[in-house]
Amino acid sequence: MSDEAPNEIELNDEQLEVVEASADTRLLVIAGAGQGKTEVVVSRIGSLVLDEGLTASDEILVLSFSRAAVSAVRTRLDVRDVAAPNVRTFDSFASVLLLGAGIEPEGSFDARIRRATQLLKEAEQSPDEIESLRHVILDEVQDLVGDRADFVLTLLKWLADDAGITALGDPLQGVYHFQLDDSLSKTSAKDVCEALTDSFGCETAGLGKNFRARGKFPKQVVLLGGELRATHDGEAAERLLEDLLLDAPDRGEIADWYDLVTPRKGRKTAVLCTTNADVLRVARYLNDKSVAHAVRRQAQDFGAARWIAGALGPLPGPKERRSDVEAALERLLAENDVDQKWNELKSAEGRTRDFDSLDLHRISRLIKARALPLPLTEPDLSSVIVSTIHRAKGLEFDSVFIVEPTWLPDGEDSWTRVRREYVALSRARDAIFICRLPHFKTKIKADDRLGRFKEEAWSRKTRGATWTKAFEFLYGDVETAYPASSHAVDARHIQETLGSLDRVGVRVYAELDETESTAEAPSYLLVTRDQQPLGRTSAAFGSAFQKTFGWLKNRPTVIDGLSLVSVETVAGDYRESERAGLGISGFWLVPRITGLARPDLNTT
C-alpha cells in the first residue's frame, strides 16, 4: 500500500464489489502491485462503518506487515472523517493478546507469536480482543508463512460465524518463503490461501487495472506482471524478466548516481538492495557523501512516536483525565490533531469503560512490549529510503534505484528471483534505474557471535587472514534504561534537542566518554556534526565493541559511519525520569541510529 494520500480514485466495478460487500462477506482479494489496494481498504472500512454500522475501534481489526499501509489508511480515513479501526502488525497484536491474558510479552517476536498461538489454542472462550470483532482485514497474506501463518489461522477460528474477512494478497509478490527453512512451522502462504477459501469460506475476487504506474518503464512492469501471472514455468518467467531489464535505464556504479537520488520537494526515492550487506554499503556511501537518507527497518523496530513523550512525559499519572491529556497534546500538535491522537491513545489503552481518562501505566506497558498500534509509532520521514527489497514491500516511490546484488546464494530457483525483482520493479510510479556497487576490497558478512553484520578487511601482514574494520550498529545499541546525559550537558537539554530535531538522516558520531567507560566496556556519546549530544551507547554495544576491538591498545575516541533514523519515545522506570528532571511518568526520548560503526583508528 502507498504511504501517501493521493487524490481519491474512482473505483472500478471489481473494486466496488469488494468495497460494498456486506460485513459478513468473506473475500480473498488477489491484489497486484498498484491496483488500488489502499483505496479499496480505505473505502471498505468506510463502508463497514458508515453503511454497515460497525464500530471502527472495537469491531474492525486490520492486520498488516506494513507501516506504509497503516499510514495511508489513517490519512485517507481522516480526510473522509471516518474513525480509524484497530490497525496493528501481526506481531503487535500477538503481544496485545498476551498482555490481555496477563502474560508479559518476552523473548523474540517469533517466540511471542508462538506463545500467542498456544494461548488461542488452549483458550476455553474467545479473548476479549477477538470476541467483539465483526470484520478482519488481512494485508499481504502472501507473506504469511510459518509461525505467523499458524497464528492468523488460529485467530480466525475464534471469529463468530457471521464475522467477515477481507484478505488481500498477490502470490507474485510472495518473497518470504525462505523463512520456512528456519521455522518450526512449515505452513506456507499457499496453505494460508487454501485455508481461507476451503476452511473459512472466502470467495476469490480481483481489483482490475493498475493505478500506480505513470512513467513509461513502470507501465511496462505492469504488462510484465500480467505475463508472469500467466506463466507457470520458472525459467520462462525469468526470461521474461531479463528481456524487460535489457530496456531498463542503467546508471552505472554508485559514484555515478549517488547525487541523483535526492528528489525534489514532495517526492520520494528508494534505493533497493537484495541483501542487508548491500544496504549497509549503500548507506555508508551516502553517509560519507552527506546525502540524507533513512535505512528502512523491520516493522518490529519502529518505536513509539516522539510526541508521546512530549505530551505524556510531564503528566504525573498513573491515570490522567481526558482534559489534561488534551491540554498536553495542544501544546505540541496542531489543534485538528488533538482529537485524533487522543482517540489513538485511548484505542491502544483499551479501557473503553473509562472513556474520560487515560491509563499511563497501560501505555507504558504497551511501549515496553513494543505492542503499540502502528498509528502510534514513529514514521520514516526521509525523502530517500535505502532498503532491502523485502522491507520495501507495501511502499511506493516516485523513483526507484535497483542495486544489482553483489552476492546471491547458490542454487537460487527462478521463481525466487522473479518474485523479488518484480517486487522491486513494481515500487515505482515514474522512473526505474538499474545500478550497481563497485568491487570492494572488504567483505560484509553475518557474525553469529556478535549477532550482527561486520565488515572484514584482508590483512596486509598475513596472507588469507582478515581483521574486522566495522560492525553493524543495531536498534538496541542506544541506551534506553535512563535518559542520556553527560558531564557537560544534562538530560533535559538532550531531551529538548531530540524533541526539536527535524534532520532525520544526518550523520552521527560516537565520541568516547572516559568518565562513563569501564575497563570491561566503553561508553560513547552519540553526537551530531555540530556536537549536539543525542544519546549514549548501550551495554550491548559496549560488549560487541569489546569482543571486536578489545585487542586495541587504546580505545578510539571517535566512531563514524552512523546516521540518525528517527527519534522515538521509550518507557522506563519513573525514578529515572524523575531523577533527570523529566517528571514521574517514565517517558523520554531516544535517538535510533543505523550504519556500520567504524572506529577511527587514528584516534586511538
Language model segments and positions:
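Conserved RecA-like helicase ATPase core segment
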Residues: L153-A248
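Core RecA-like ATPase module of SF1/SF2 helicases and allied nucleic-acid translocases
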Residues: Q35, R67, S92, V96, ...
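Short glycine-/polar-rich loops that comprise or flank the Walker A/P-loop
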Residues: A56-E59, D161-A163, D170-P171, S199-T204, ...
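Conserved interdomain hinge at the start of the Helicase C-terminal
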Residues: D250-R267
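P-loop NTPase Walker
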Residues: M1-E104
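A short beta-strand-to-loop transition that corresponds to the Sensor-1 phosphate-sensing loop
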Residues: I45, S64-R67, D91, L168-Q173, ...
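Conserved active-site motif detector
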Residues: D447-T604
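Conserved helicase NTPase motor core
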Residues: I9-A33, N86, S95, G100-S185, ...
